[in-house]
Amino acid sequence: MIYSFSTARVVFGIGASVGVAAHAARMGRRCLLVTGSRPGRCDWLLEDLRSVMDDVRCVALVREPETAFISAQAEAARQAGSDVVVAIGGGSVIDAGKALAALAANGGDVFTYLEVVGQGRPFEHEPLPMVAVPTTAGTG
């Protein structure tokens, strides 16, 4: 039997977050930063990103992401020409970042791609590159 497993790069440890902006800048130049309900806690990252990116847009997720919010923010990211997503926060923020990366690269809204309750269309393009900076530990 032959198995193949490929995972994303995982960097962890004390001080690992210092390299986030430089890593993201190797993936793109126009960043969409997704944060939790208190974006001020991420000012250090916003400043780092602005020092190495051509443009940085910040989106704060104040509660569980709703489909209309994700669709609207993905369209705004597309219009802004965002080419990399950085998400810093808990599970909802990371999930929202993944959804935004996929939708910004493919167009349409959430229901275009949702199975069962939507059209269930497959993505035509790879999602935008994404850097996840989890700030909580959980089972998800």
Where are the language model's segments positioned?
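ATP/NTP phosphate-donor binding region
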Residues: 1-84
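Glycine/threonine-rich beta-strand-loop-alpha-helix active-site module
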Residues: 68-140
